A protein has these predicted regions:
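Glycine-rich NAD(P)-binding loop of Rossmann-like domains
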Residues: 93-95, 125-162, 190
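Rossmann-like adenosine-cofactor binding region
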Residues: 179-276
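Rossmann-like dinucleotide-binding domain for NAD(H)/NADP(H)
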Residues: 96, 232-234, 238-325
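N-terminal glycine-/charge-rich "phosphate-binding" loop or analogous flexible N-terminal tail
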Residues: 1-48
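Oxidoreductase and adenylate-handling cofactor-binding alpha/beta cores
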Residues: 108-124, 168-172, 302-315
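Phosphate/diphosphate ligand-binding glycine-rich loop within oxidoreductases
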Residues: 47-129
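Conserved beta-strand positions in the Rossmann-like core of class I SAM-dependent methyltransferases
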Residues: 175
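Glycine-rich, N-terminal phosphate-binding loop of Rossmann-like dinucleotide-binding domains
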Residues: 55, 74, 209-211, 238-239, ...
Length: 325
């Protein structure tokens, strides 16, 4: 049988029993071992063919000659990839898969919550509420509707599509970019290649960064992009802090070149008390909670079930990382 190692550093006590039930349903085809990183026995490492983990330390990886699949449970795997992860000592390739899609519902609702807050002044009313101030006149020229606006979603993957679907329900026009614009991409009115990314920026009232962080996507949004904004534009980052140039975004929003910013991810987390983000003008900050939802492990279990079924049937696995990125 194939040996599966769950690197469980206290994520969720239900995770082990849930994965156990999934593995048992394959009638002995797979065997599950669950250990914390520090406690994995040598013989288990040598047998392991599939790893389920948040990250796989290189020290453990080197002791796994038979690895076939690494299944991360995060959608972003920046900082978790290294050359020897992809190839065994005998030259055999290893599949690396992400948790893409697990977070789609929560991340997309998170972005919509920020958008709606700006459109309807919820954050302004909240401040006024705490100050016991009736702020109707102050808000009068700041409110608008999402309906009729154009949203540009940079990264039209599973999270990007979930955002687009919800934006369309609000009557917004959806434009996206992705590496392969020929791929079928539901919920988008227009899909552009990353080369046409500045066309998206010019067309958008709201811009959402929903990409993984790779060497190609780092500092994707900065001074140059802020300079070409043609209208009051709101910018949201649900991906990673490294996708944009924080210094220029802060300067842009504080000087009014960017209408408002919604941000869930930062270069430094937790955000230190003296960070300029806390005092940025018209900015909504959330503490990297976009992916948080109570069904998280259930969704991860469903992904593992799909992967094991594919392996059992000799079909390709999903969510695979392209090692050339």
């Amino acid at each position: 049988s194939m040996h599966i190692l769950l690197l469980n550093n206290g994520e969720d006590e239900t995770l082990v029993s849930q994965l156990h039930d999934i593995v048992v349903s394959f009638n002995g085809m797979f065997t599950l071992h669950a250990y914390s990183e520090a406690a994995v026995p040598q013989d288990v490492l040598e047998q392991t063919e599939i790893v389920l983990c948040a990250a796989l330390p290189a020290t453990l990886r080197r002791q796994m000659p038979n690895l076939k699949l690494v299944q991360f449970w995060s959608a972003g795997v920046d900082g978790k990839l290294y050359p020897e992860l992809f190839t065994n000592a005998n030259g055999q390739d290893v599949m690396i898969s992400t948790g893409s899609g697990i977070h789609a519902a929560s991340c997309s609702e998170h972005v919509l919550a920020m958008m709606l807050s700006f459109a309807r002044g919820i954050h302004l009313s909240f401040d006024a509420q705490r100050a016991a101030t009736w702020s109707r006149r102050e808000q009068a020229d700041k409110l608008f509707t999402l309906e009729g606006k154009t949203v540009g979603i940079v990264g039209a993957g599973q999270i990007g599509q979930a955002i687009a679907r919800r934006c369309q329900a609000f009557g917004m026009r959806t434009v996206g970019t992705r590496r392969d614009p020929e791929k079928p991409t539901p919920h988008f009115d227009y899909v552009l290649s990353h080369l046409q990314y500045h066309d998206l920026i010019l067309a958008s009232d709201m811009i959402v960064l929903a990409l993984p962080l790779t060497p190609h996507t780092r500092w994707l949004f900065g001074e140059e992009e802020i300079e070409i904004l043609r209208r009051p534009t709101y910018v949201f980052n649900i991906g990673r802090g490294g996708l944009w140039d924080e210094r220029h975004v802060l300067q842009g929003v504080n000087r009014g070149w960017i209408a408002g910013v919604g941000v869930d991810v930062f270069l430094e987390e937790p955000l230190p008390p003296d960070s300029p983000w806390w005092t940025a003008r018209n900015t909504i900050i959330t503490p990297h909670t976009g992916g948080v939802n109570p069904d998280y492990w259930e969704r991860f279990g469903a992904l593992v079930m799909r992967q094991l079924t594919a392996i059992a049937e000799g079909q390709p696995c999903t969510n695979l990382v392209d090692r050339d990125l």
